[in-house]
Amino acid sequence: MSQSKNLLYPEKWLSRASTGVRVACELRMRIISGLIESGTILSENKLAAEFSVSRSPIREALKILASEKIIRLERMGAVVIGLTEKEIGEIYDVRLVMETFVFERLGRANVDELVTDLSKILEMMKVSIKYKDADEFSFQDVLFHETIVRSINHSYILMIWNNLKPVMESFILLSMRARLKEKYEDFERILDNHELYIKAIKTKDRDLMLKSLHQNFDDVQGKVEDLWLSQQMLAKGAEQEND
């Protein structure tokens, strides 16, 4: 796969990924960002030429995206569906239900090691913000929540998480990039929310757990606005390149 001048998905996150997964990650970002609009028909031949790969990894990528319901495979090509505000809200609904369940399980578990691991990740999030690295912050943010989910060793909860992760990760990445440029001061609130998560887990305070969950998941409109900002910035950048 050739190095494109405008890859949206961080290359360093793909060191062990197959070519098909690499293409899927990039196309997913372009679709969620709005660079590839809903209704667009994706051609295997054109994508193969753009990414300098054979059609086989393109087919793999399109199957992945179809399983995530952001494209629809048809005879004339893959039709882009995209991601609506309603669907973004539904992703956070599922996360709220899932992480509430995980928190309930943690109330009966030894959480010392988990608290230590989460504290380390939080420090990395703080460093990322200090150096204004939205990509690393997004990586650590996803890792923070994944560490919580994995801690209860529940195979079906983990399966749900893994199914949500690709779209969720792309959405978070785009949102955090926009937030870094337009609402940098808001990262302090995000860090405080994660501090609250750790405190809730450590103390096993159910009310604090619910408060931390709702503070993180209730502001879906704000997250959608961040994505909208990201789309505007990317569109502006594309216009400048074409001038």
Swiss-Prot record:
GO terms for MF: DNA binding; DNA-binding transcription factor activity
Pfam family membership, one: GntR
Keywords noted in UniProt: DNA-binding, Gluconate utilization, Repressor, Transcription, Transcription regulation
Biological processes per GO annotation: D-gluconate metabolic process
Domain of life: Bacteria
DNA-binding region: 44-63
Keyword set includes Hydrolase: no
SMART domains given in the database record: FCD, HTH_GNTR
Sequence ranges assigned to domain HTH gntR-type in this UniProt record: 17-83
Function: Transcriptional repressor of the gluconate operon (gntRKPZ), which encodes the proteins for gluconate utilization. Represses mRNA synthesis by binding to the gnt operator; the binding is suppressed by gluconate or glucono-delta-lactone.
Descriptive protein name: Gluconate operon transcriptional repressor
Upper lineage: Bacteria, Bacillati, Bacillota, Bacilli, Bacillales
This protein's encoding gene: gntR
